[in-house]
Regions:
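Walker A/P-loop NTP-binding motif of AAA+ ATPase domains
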Residues: 2-167
C-alpha cells in the first residue's frame, strides 16, 4: 500500500518537518490518518506494523479509560493521554473511532452540549498533536466531518480476495 508507505516516510522525517519554521506555517502539526473497512481486514495489524517498522510504540486508546460520565473528566483524561504521548513519542491508535469521533448532534439537552464539547476538545488536541494519530473504524460515515477534513490520509481496508488471504 503506497498510502502506508507515505505514513512511514512522514515518520522518518517528522523531526525535520516539525522543526522547520517555514513548513510549520504551511502544514498541520503531526500526521492524522483514517483506516476504514470491515472487521478483520488488517487495520489494527497495519498500525502495529507501522510502529514496529519505525521503532515506535503504538498506544491503543482504551475508550473505557478515557470516557467518563462526569463533566470535565473526559477532557482531563484526554489531556493526560496527549501530554504523555507527546513525551513518549507514541503513535496514538483509536480503534472503533466512531464511538469517540462521531458526528456532533444539535443540542437538545445538557448531555448533547457536553458531548459536543468533548468532541470539540478532542478535535483540538488531535490537531495540536505533532505525532501520528490513526483512527480505525468500521463505520466511516459516522465520523464527524470536522475530523475527516483534518486527516491527511484515508486508507480503505477492503475484504481480501481468496488469493490475498493465501499470502
Amino acid at each position: 500500500m503506497d498510502e502506508v508507505e507515505n505514513i512511514n516516510t512522514w515518520l522518518k522525517f517528522k523531526d525535520e518537518i516539525n522543526s522547520d519554521k517555514t513548513l510549520q506555517k504551511k502544514i498541520n502539526k503531526g500526521f492524522k490518518c483514517l483506516f476504514y473497512g470491515p472487521p478483520g481486514t488488517g487495520k489494527t495489524l497495519s498500525a502495529s506494523l507501522i510502529g514496529k517498522k519505525n521503532n515506535m510504540d503504538v498506544y491503543r486508546i482504551d475508550l473505557s479509560q478515557i470516557i467518563s460520565k462526569y463533566v470535565g473528566e473526559t477532557e482531563k483524561n484526554l489531556s493526560r493521554l496527549f501530554d504523555l504521548a507527546e513525551n513518549k513519542n507514541w503513535i496514538l491508535f483509536f480503534d472503533e473511532a466512531e464511538s469517540l469521533f462521531s458526528k456532533r448532534t444539535s443540542v437538545g439537552d445538557s448531555k448533547d452540549k457536553f458531548a459536543n464539547q468533548q468532541t470539540a476538545f478532542l478535535l483540538q488536541r488531535i490537531e495540536d498533536y505533532n505525532g501520528l494519530v490513526i483512527l480505525a473504524t468500521n463505520l466511516k460515515p459516522n465520523i464527524d466531518r470536522a475530523f475527516t477534513r483534518r486527516i491527511q490520509s484515508t486508507i480503505n481496508f477492503p475484504i481480501p480476495t481468496i488469493n490475498e488471504r493465501k499470502i
